[in-house]
Amino acid sequence: MSDVNKVVLAYSGGLDTSVILKWLQDTYQCEVVTFTADIGQGEELEPAREKARQFGVKEIYIDDLREEFVRDFVFPMFRANTVYEGEYLLGTSIARPLIAKRLIEIAQETNADAVSHGATGKGNDQVRFELGAYALNPNIKIIAPWREWDLLSREKLLAYAEKHGIPVEMKHRQGGSPYSMDANLLHISYEGRHLENPAAEAEEDMWRWTVSPERAPDEAEYLEIEYRNGDPISLNGKTLKPHELLAELNRLGGKHGIGRLDLVENRYVGMKSRGCYETPGGTILLKAHRAIESITLDREVAHLKDDLMPRYASMIYNGYWWSPERLALQALIDHTQQTVNGWVKLKLYKGNVIVTGRDSGTDSLFDPNIATFEDDAGAYDHRDAGGFIKLNALRLRIAANLRNKK
């Protein structure tokens, strides 16, 4: 294992990655560079710096990636109205390519010959991190401790930590959190423990970002989102940076019990997994984006996007953000968004996001003179519909005649 001289570790400062840090130093006899990403998880990150220093780490990166995360990853994904398996808004999946990108950049900056992560050998994240890393640097070495070591239980991790003087928070000594959680500006996820029984209802005190819809305010709240080229740029008339806008939508959505999801999903590695998610701001954005597209996109373009979306969602879920097919599809999606300009009004009420209005001063394809049920002064000739129907019925009539002859 002496071929590794320096490794960049995706480091949270928690129990798992702190054990990994020490394990890398001992097993590979290498220098470790730590990288901690701030993508809006809401945790204090400076303790990670202090922990890394305690292990003798000299190069410590703590990067605020919130703006880049929302601008270059979340918003491009939402231009496609992306949903995996009908429900999941891909909050964890979309964060991984950014972390992989920064790992590779830091490896280049520090002349490291390897990168490492704390994803387990059972999950999707190992695939996402590593596909991203190889796509950006095909010659990088990747160390995945969970696929190499024998510390496969919490008891073994704690024993290793105690043996090597790794600080352990009291919650871990007492059994740890009842859930495995992952958070960023788009969502927070919960897995493990009693959630592994898909028949068991999630406990109410699990949810952290949203109130129960039953306990949400009895009065609805209205908001208006302005779009430019498919991306939201302002909320209630105030222009905001992408990460600020999403954070405020998270606050508003959480207040009204919006964005809860209890899902059994198909992991890329082959198993089914139950997870619970809170995505309040993303749930609002999905509804708003579809609303502004409804009046600014040509019908066939909109339907084509809907046809392609599941494939696009799978690319992200499975870790192919940096693949040539995702980049090609993104170019098509972005082209369609040139006319997606205007505003959407929505009402938030007890877990529901209700569109109450939408308009575009520059790109609306809604023509009230044609769409009206009143006298349209000849804008639409009803007689044309007869020929349209006959031509579209031709193949149906031919098939019916054939059946009648049998």
UniProtKB/Swiss-Prot annotation:
GO terms for biological process: argininosuccinate metabolic process; L-arginine biosynthetic process; urea cycle. L-aspartate binds at T120, N124, D125. ATP binds at A10, Y11, S12, G13, G14, L15, D16, T17, S18, A37, G118. Its main location: cytoplasm. Keywords: Amino-acid biosynthesis, Arginine biosynthesis, ATP-binding, Cytoplasm, Ligase, Nucleotide-binding. Homotetramer. PANTHER family: ARGININOSUCCINATE SYNTHASE. Belongs to the argininosuccinate synthase family. Type 1 subfamily. This is Argininosuccinate synthase. It comes from Methylobacillus flagellatus (strain ATCC 51484 / DSM 6875 / VKM B-1610 / KT). The gene is argG.
